[in-house]
């Protein structure tokens, strides 16, 4: 019997959200309410305002609960670090789903906050490894790595600012997957509202039965979502070794993995060629490993599924 990897057994709909952005409570330029209004007015359904959780900002979680309404919700969270920023191989995470009174870590163990966040039920995303020049060779020794649920493979602020070559974290995602870590994929704006194009460029579409912070977190941790710059992943149906993909208009739909294995189920090249909206793949070549669906639309915007373990 076919199973839908995007929706599971849940009856619901997709909700658009961003898990990585900042306000004037840390190093962003707009106040929390202004940030929430900007995302709500741009058609988003939810937001995690992930201000930096550091001593210089008072070790506080920005409380956005008063900004929720019946059509837009917020997830409390913060950007945590594994070590002081100047330390070699420090890394940063969004912890989405923190209590408002989340306390500071011990001075000699910043990573304790990451472990504690996961223990409290937060969805933990490793952020911008490319921006931080975090080497894959250091991954096995990273503190609290077992608390990380997902890796940010696209950081829109980096892509739109002066660091486009640092916006890609796919090397870390694939490296961790090849080492046996079952991590998910993620993307975020990292918006600081410091220039006109640092927002609304990479988000998650989360399949859920209700617009509720706890329900959204459950879906995120279960992998019932995909990241996108615009293309829609509408269906990922697995039946035995066959994977059927339904999308919005696409220039290409492919199935890929780390290393040198990839399959391209549907491609459309050249002027005037009609886009595709579906593809079918054989999962057998990926048995014992993993793969993911990648979509490129006619304007070059991308979407990725979470890893699939056949």
Where are these regions (language model features)?
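C-terminal functional module detector
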Residues: 1-14, 32, 179-184, 191-310
């Amino acid at each position: 019997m076919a199973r839908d990897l995007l929706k599971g057994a849940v009856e619901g709909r997709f909700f658009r959200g961003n898990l990585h952005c900042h306000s004037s409570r840390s190093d962003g330029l707009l106040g929390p309410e202004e940030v929430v209004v900007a995302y709500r007015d741009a058609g988003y359904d939810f937001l995690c305002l992930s201000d930096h959780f550091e001593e210089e900002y008072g070790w506080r979680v920005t409380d956005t609960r008063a900004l929720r309404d019946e059509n837009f919700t917020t997830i409390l969270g913060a950007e945590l670090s594994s070590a002081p920023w100047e330390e070699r191989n420090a890394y940063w995470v969004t912890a989405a789903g923190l209590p408002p009174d989340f306390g500071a870590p011990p001075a000699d163990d910043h990573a304790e906050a990451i472990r504690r966040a996961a223990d409290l039920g937060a969805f933990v995303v490793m952020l911008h490894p490319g921006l931080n020049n975090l080497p894959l060779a250091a991954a096995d020794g990273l503190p609290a790595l077992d608390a990380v649920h997902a890796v940010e493979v696209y950081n829109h602020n980096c892509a739109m600012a002066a660091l486009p070559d640092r916006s890609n974290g796919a090397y870390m995602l694939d490296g961790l997957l090849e080492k046996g870590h079952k991590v998910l994929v993620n993307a975020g704006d990292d918006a600081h509202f410091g220039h006109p194009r640092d927002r609304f460029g990479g988000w998650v579409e989360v399949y859920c039965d209700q617009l509720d912070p706890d329900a959204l977190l459950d879906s995120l941790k279960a992998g019932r979502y995909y990241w996108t710059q615009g293309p829609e992943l509408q269906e990922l149906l697995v039946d035995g070794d066959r994977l059927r993909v339904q999308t919005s208009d696409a220039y290409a739909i492919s199935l890929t993995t780390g290393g040198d294995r990839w399959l391209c189920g549907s491609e459309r090249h050249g002027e005037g060629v009609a886009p595709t909206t579906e593809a079918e793949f054989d999962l057998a070549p990926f048995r014992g490993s993993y793969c993911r669906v990648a979509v490129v639309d006619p304007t070059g915007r991308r979407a990725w599924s979470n890893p699939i373990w056949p």
